[in-house]
Structure formats: C-alpha cells, structure tokens
Amino acid sequence: MQSFRQYRRMRRDLQESIKLHGPYAAAGDRHVQPTDDILEDADDARLEKGIHSMNGHGQSPYSTPGIVLHDGQRVTVPGVNLRRASEICERVNTKTLFIVGFDGPDDQLNPKNWSIGRKWATLGIVGTTGMLVGWASSIDSTVIKQGQEAFGVSEVAESLATALFLFAFGFGSLVAAPFSETVGRNPVYIATLSILMIFTMASGLAPNFGAQLAFRFLAGLFGCTPMTTFGGSMADIFDPMDRTYAFPVCCTLSFLGPFLAPMVGAFIGQSTHISWRWTEWCTLIMAALVTGAIFLFVPETYGPVLLQWKAKQLREITGDPRFMAEIELRQTSLVTRLMHSCSRPFHLFFREIMVALFTMYLVVVYIVLFGFLTGYEFIFGRTYGFTQGSVGLTFIGMNIGFLIAFAMVPHIYFSYKKRLQNAIENGHNGLPPEERLWFAMYGAPWLPISLFWMGWTSYPSISYWSPLVASVAFGFSVQGIFISTYQYLIDTYELFAASALVSATFFRYIAAGAMVIVSIPMYGNLGVHWSLTLLGCISVLMTPVPYIFYKYGHVIRQRNKKTP
C-alpha cells in the first residue's frame, strides 16, 4: 500500500516538475518568448543534428539538461542526463538515451534524504523481520520434549526441526541478495514473509515427523531472505557514518529474536492448557503483523528501483521510450547473478585470510550461542532442577547482555566520529577499517571468560545466579564481536562486501544448525563443565583475531588485490 502511494506520488511530482521546466510552463499561449532553458534545448536539438550551437557556448548535448523528445517537444527534466547508448549497453540501438537519476543531492526521492523520523520508522518496522525469523528459528527448540513424545522419535531427532531451519537459512543466504536488487525490497519482504507464514502453518499442522522437518526446512529457506534484505534496507537509507549506530539496532533485533522466543516457547511447552504446537501459531501471528506493517507503512527504499519507477513514469508521461534507468540496462541476467552470488562467497572464504578468520570467529560464537538452545536444559534444568518454563526464562541474562552492548553504541559512535574528524583535519580521506574493531576488542576477552565462568560455577552447591550473570557477559561479548566483524568486512571489501558477509552468514548458520544436534549428546556425555571448557578453549584461540587485525590489518590489505 505504501509503495503504491509512493509510486502515484512520484507520478504527480514528475508531472508538475516537467510542466514547470517545460517550454510553455509560464503560460498557456504557445507564442510566448522562449526562455534560456528553451534556447539551450534548441541548441541540443541542433547539436544532435550536427549543427553548431546558437549561443556559441559549444556545450556537449551529453552534459546539458535540455531534452528534445521524439515529437519535437522541448523540455527540461531534473535528474536526467543524455548519454550515448554505446557507452552503456551494446544491445541498445538508439543513438541517445535519457538516463534517469536523482534530481540532486537533496532529492527527497532518494531515501538517504528522508527525515530522521521517517528513516527510523522504516528501519524499526523492517528490523522486526530480523527478530521474527530469529524467533522462528529457535522457538521449536523449547518444545523438543513435547515434539518427540508426539511423533515418537528421539530427542536428538526432534532437534532436527531447529537444525534444518538453520541449515536452510544458510543455504538460502547464498541466493537471497540478487532478488531484492532486481525487484526491490518490498516485494521480497511481502512475498517471502507470506511464504514463511504458509510453511509455518504447515509445520504447526504437520501430521508426522517427516512433514514437520520438510516444512521447517522450507520455512527457513524463505525466512532467510527478509533477514538478508533488511540489512540492505538499512544501507539504502543511512549513510556510512549514520550506520555506525543504525547497524547495531539491526544486530540487536536479530539477536533478541532467537533468545526471546525460548522465554515464551518454554512456557507453551510446559502448559497443560494449550498445545505445544502453539509455538508455531505464535510465530504465524507475529509474521502476519510484521507483513501487514510492511505492506501498509514501509515505502520502497532501493534507489535503483525507485529510478526505474521514475523512468517508467517519464516514458508514460512524455511518450518517449528513451528514458531509462541504469538498472534497466543491466546486461547480466538474474541467473548469472545468482551463480555469482553462490560462488563468490566461497572464493573469498578460501582465498581471503580476513574473511576466513572472521568467519571462523563467528562460527565459534554461533556454535556456542545456538548450542545453548538445547544446552540450557543441562545447565539450569538438570543442574538446578528448573522447570521447563524457568529454563526458558534464564535466557533473559543473555538478552540483557545484548542490550548492555547496545547501550555502548553512543560511546562507540561519538568516539568514531571524533577520530574521523581528526583524520579529515589532518588531511586524510577517512579512517582505516581497523578502527571498526574497537567493539570487538572490548567484547572478545569476555567470550572465553564467560564460558569458563559458567562452566565451573554450574554446581548445585553454587547459586544459579553465577552462571546466569556469566550469560550476561556472554551476550555482551557476542554482540560486540558481531557488530565489529560486519562493519569491518563492509569497510574492508566495499564492492565485495555483500559476498564477504554472505560467506560469514552461510558458514555460521550451517555450524549453528549442526551444533543444535551435537550439543545434546555433547552435554550429556561430557557434562556441563567439560563441554563449556572445550568451547571456552576454542574461543581462546580466536580471541586474538580482532587485536591482530587492528595492528596488522593495514599490512594485509596492502597485499590484497580485493581490498582498497
């Protein structure tokens, strides 16, 4: 609905703009004296025919705002530039194209020029997609006991309902980005969330174990797309400096979803009044609310698609087919871009040491993080005798840690802004990407500390408050590492940033899905103490990563062809 209104408003504004800048905008009398703009338009018409300019300026027709339409009408359209077709696309036969762009740096059509309120309202709504799909990924893990009883399978087998969702999430991330870069953000949100709702409902109605697994996998496959797209929406509306605080908002919402869900799902599983399948109905209700909010209130944010709309409107208004947006001249097919989207992340992972190490760091973080979905039953349920619902409530500690990390964002933002201003005053173009690693350096030591702390204080003789407080430190560490890693890869790889992030997304969700399955026998056979000690030792090996790259990252980048 909001996109439709945006489209109609664009047409109205264009009609007014063309009338304002047209040759007869001042009056209805066609015999009025031509303005300077009209003379420039006439010059352009002569230049296209090889005739010298009337005003003697000798300007190229490809750098002036005047446009001569096919019917001979002369108009000036803001934001449109003349370009030779051969410079852009070999398959276009016409001599000259009118390339449609934004009217200028302050054009309100450009989402980066929206008001602060409109930007944050948009981000707030689309950001809930990250929370939603995170919620959907984990909530089934809280009713494993009820699911195994209903379908007559083992605890490990029923954990596949969560694991397959995460596996599908990883595989889907490889192909998600090109779709929103072809049709726009909103169609992807609405279509994929609608399909997610269908498969979530099917999972809730699944008559047997196989059907449940199949529907959960398909739900994860389509659920990854809005998760991937909302990061693109953020980039559409915020400039790089503002992303310093906008990106943590996205991260916080994405992390809260998977670990708020157990706080609700565990009580659903424990309840004697409602079915355990209400975990799916809660997800379905939330998905319907989010999809409805996007449909009603979120405008399209992808700039190239907005310019495509503008070009289409100009073709309809003027009757001239030469108005084109650059996205319409893209010669690479969707299939080709999907193939590149699938292959380039692996190419970067196996050939780029930065991508490989930070991806492995996130893999370690995620195997611990999602291993807790099933591991908390061993830590709090079997050690302290907590009920199923109370075990779910213990995830509040991790969520508090996420929020503490989020509370540090203003400090990180203003510190970065001050260093950036100093760098510019000293004649530098900006800060090196390594300046993004401060958050990770704050959080990295707390990852092994929190795991050892939790592992060796989880005894019935020691208060449950000790491992619960350790989980707060763990949540703080995870959030800081994640935010810094993503911002560092974005700043380092620039053109290839999307592929670098997809690489990290794919491997960490595959690892997370595997850990959901493995954690049950691991905690059962090794026990809580040695399981967390093992994970703590692995995290110790990765702790130096942000410090090493902060000191030597610039040297590695100088030797690397894919980084600036």
Swiss-Prot record:
Null mutant phenotype: Reduces secretion of kojic acid. Leads to the declined expression of kap6.
A molecular-function term among this protein's GO annotations: transmembrane transporter activity
TM region positions: 120-140, 159-179, 187-207, 217-237, 249-269, 278-298, 353-373, 389-409, 437-457, 462-482, 500-520, 530-550
GO cellular component assignments: plasma membrane
Keyword rRNA processing: no
Glycan-modified residues: N113
Inducing factors: Expression is controlled by the kojic acid gene cluster transcription factor kojR. Expression is also positively regulated by the secondary metabolism general regulator laeA. Finally, nitrogen deficiency also positively regulates expression. Expression is also regulated by the kojic acid related proteins kap1 and kap6.
Family: Belongs to the major facilitator superfamily.
Protein name: MFS-type transporter kojT
